[in-house]
């Protein structure tokens, strides 16, 4: 971990690689007047919108919608089974399980044609008091239980003892984006009205504590966090149904779930502050988390070490080293297909456009894990056997 100061703000950086966009955004963050204690940068750091992905930002009495990001509540879930991977026939894996999952779960920008039962939606929220969620609710009932696009994925994996695992990466779909964009606009208007020193072109407009706008965003953000969990839970339920039909004697352990795009009130260094985790995972002492690799590489079930210097956080994955556009333009399709085929991984890479999320576009997950050995310890090492990308 490297320590330095920028614009008077201490920075603690676990990342060994940092792109130019991220450096500028770090400088912008360090100029904010309400940063608390220091800025923490995880090893999967790379440029985002306003704040780099892989950043943990602590603030005094303000919340920044773009420091949470557009996919509010995005996160991971994983389930271990009692099935040895070597006992699954190839035809069962490809034709029953993978085909069944694709049939049950809409991918990319697709959604269900009919609204899902409201029992799958978040409970105990006053939706009537929410501007965006109320407007988007009917649409959201068709999005719950859908994967989404980008780096979202469903993987079947095996651990070092050969047991089958299911892993999902997904979030709050279009709902989270609508909430983020709306409240970022609200924050920008407020900041300009009151002559804030935080310029709108930084994409770091904020909502002050004890304002209606802060409370409104906070409630809608919490709904999106819960919606992200509901989304992953429903997908996991339907994947389990597909596997149960193909392998009737299968049993499933309880689901591990953790989010990596959200804000929360927490106590650090003797004070209550708002922690923004954007592409960062909570890693309190003993807390179980999930750090996925890129397509075709290892993923990890981890246990937090509660390191106070990272605000008890760790990375959320490997982190990009190449934009999606650059990956499509520069990577070799045949080479990337061969990498997966050589490992025997069932995949659906067929065209140049599918190269957006291949492993060559990401940092080496093994190096990322080595760089955060003081943040988490590895509980389970997982390797992919089949992958579905959004």
Where are these regions (language model features)?
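Beta-strand elements of modular eukaryotic interaction domains
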Residues: 30
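A generic, well-ordered mixed alpha/beta core segment in the N-terminal half of proteins
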Residues: 67-127
């Amino acid at each position: 971990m490297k320590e330095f100061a920028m614009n008077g703000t201490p920075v603690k950086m676990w990342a060994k690689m940092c792109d130019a966009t991220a450096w500028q955004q770090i400088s912008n963050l360090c100029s904010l007047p309400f940063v608390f204690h220091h800025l923490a940068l995880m090893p999967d750091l790379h440029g985002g919108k306003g704040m780099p992905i892989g950043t943990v930002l602590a603030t005094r009495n303000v919340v920044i919608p773009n420091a949470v990001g557009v996919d509010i509540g995005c996160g991971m879930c994983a389930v271990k089974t009692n099935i040895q991977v070597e006992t699954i026939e190839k035809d069962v894996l490809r034709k029953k399980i993978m085909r069944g999952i694709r049939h049950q779960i809409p991918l990319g920008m697709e959604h269900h044609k009919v609204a899902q039962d409201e029992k799958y939606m978040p409970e105990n929220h006053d939706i009537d008091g929410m501007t965006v969620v109320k407007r988007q609710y009917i649409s959201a009932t068709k999005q719950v239980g859908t994967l989404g696009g980008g780096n979202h994925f469903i993987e079947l994996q095996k651990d070092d003892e050969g047991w089958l695992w299911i892993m999902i990466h997904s979030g709050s779909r279009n709902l989270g984006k609508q909430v983020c964009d709306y409240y970022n606009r609200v924050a920008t208007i407020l900041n300009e009205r009151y002559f804030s020193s935080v310029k709108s072109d930084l994409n770091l407009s904020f909502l002050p504590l004890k304002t209606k706008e802060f409370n409104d965003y906070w409630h809608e953000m919490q709904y999106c966090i819960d919606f992200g969990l509901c989304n992953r839970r429903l997908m996991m339920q339907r994947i389990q149904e597909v596997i149960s039909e193909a392998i009737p004697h299968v049993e499933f352990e309880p689901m591990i779930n953790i989010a990596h795009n959200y804000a929360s009130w927490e106590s650090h260094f003797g004070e209550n502050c708002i922690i923004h985790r954007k592409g960062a995972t909570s890693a309190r002492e003993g807390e179980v988390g999930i750090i996925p690799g890129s397509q075709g590489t290892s993923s990890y079930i981890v246990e937090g070490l509660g390191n106070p210097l990272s605000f008890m956080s760790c990375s959320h994955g490997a982190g990009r080293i190449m934009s999606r556009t650059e990956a499509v333009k520069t990577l070799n399709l045949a080479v990337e297909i061969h990498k997966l085929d050589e490992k025997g991984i069932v995949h659906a890479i067929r065209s140049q456009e599918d190269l957006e999320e291949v492993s060559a576009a990401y940092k080496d997950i093994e190096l990322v894990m080595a760089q955060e050995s003081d943040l988490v310890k590895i509980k389970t090492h997982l390797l992919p056997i089949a992958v579905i990308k959004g």
